[in-house]
Every structure is written in C-alpha cells, then in structure tokens.
C-alpha cells in the first residue's frame, strides 16, 4: 500500500505537464515565425528589397550576377512596391520622382518583370540622341573619353564581337564619363554608331509596318522627345546594348517611357556578385564564383 499518496499524485502531474510544455514551446515557435515573416514583409515593403542583375545593359557599373539592395522609400509606395505580388494601393503614397542619374528599379509596363536602368529624363524634359551623344533640353550632356573598361569574361558574361575586344580573358570596351547638369556623373559604354536595327516582338519575330517592311530604330539618332507628365525616360549605361525608353514597350524588349507608378525603388549597394560558375550542389563553388571586389560597390 502507498503510505504517501502525494508521491503518486506528483508523478501524474509531472506526466501531464510535459505535453502542455511541448504545446507551449510549439506555440511560441509559431509566434516567433509569424513575427519574423511580418518583420521581413515590413522591411521589404517600406525599407529595402533585393534584386539581381540579369543582363549587361548597365555595364560597366553593374554586371550580370550582381545582387543589389534597393531603397523603397525614395519614390513612395504602391502595389508595385510590395513583395511577392501582394495586393496594395494602385495610386502611389508619398510619391516622389527620381533625380536625374538615379539608378532605378521598375516594373516592365507589359510583363511586370523587374528592370534596372538609369533615370535620364523627367516630366517636361526633351530627350534626343545625335550620333550617340545624349541631348538634354537642347544641350549636349557633357561626355568625355575615359579610356577602356575591362570586363572579365565568365560563365554569365560574354564579349560582344561588335563592340568589345578580348584581352587576357577580359572584354575591353571604350568607355565615356557622362556628366549631367546636376553634376551627377557615371561611366557609359559606346560601341560606335550601330545604325538602324530591326525591332522584334516578345516571341523574337521581326516587327513589320503596315506595308510588311521591318520596323527599324536607330538608337544613336532619335528625334527630340518631350517626357510626358508622370513619366520617366530611362536608359542603360551600356548604350548600344540596352532596350530602354528609346524603344517601344514590348514584353522582354524595350520599355518605353516609364510611368511613375511602376517605380519600385532606387538601387543602392551591391550585396553579392557571382560570375555564374557556382553550382548549388557544390557549396565551395559559391565562394570561388564570388566577385569579392564588387561587394559593397555603390551606385
């Protein structure tokens, strides 16, 4: 006979307490996860978000494989600012236009994919190109030869034969320093006068006019264009390898002038950069593929 029944009662209490403690632990963990998700959503919505560079249109400053952090607050917020395609207001809150020279992230007006270009023209500005020279409000933008840019060739970076020269496993391009009236300056690449080029649609087929003739655009020589209200004229720094506001908006192709509502953020810092040779199943290649010298570069 049990002379001390309290012992049996305590044992029963201890056994029932364990499942309760486990339930509390799981509950605390779920609450922590929800708080973490909420914190990430708030950060990516209102403060900053991350973007990758998929093409060479912003050479020499940005390279394929760069991972950027972009500030969300400079241009305000709307549905295009929200991560993961979450619903939001269609009209921008705390709206601001970019400054000329800002590197902007925006949604393509047709397919809504993320693009990155440099803001060149604001509402009311007149933009034109003459033999590769940018004309802003009737005045040539200051443009100086700046030697050559040497872009290392890698798994995600080739060398264009129509504009570059292979030198010691790098591609050499002529570069120029362009300086806007505000004093903002940056490097651009120029392959020379490329002449008129045919436009293609989203499937890669040639676009034709009503007479069946290919539609041609000479991006080095364009007629003066006045940027409408609420729009931004953008260009890639790699002037002869960029489908930008000089081209009509076509999915996967040109972007036309960008509606202010399509702005996502202002590019800031390169957080990571890879030459494209890494393999997910070989973790050590994540480090051998890294371009360590690019990490921390600012726009």
Where in the sequence are the language-model features?
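Soluble "head" domains of membrane/secretory-pathway proteins
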Residues: 2-27, 42, 47, 51-52, ...
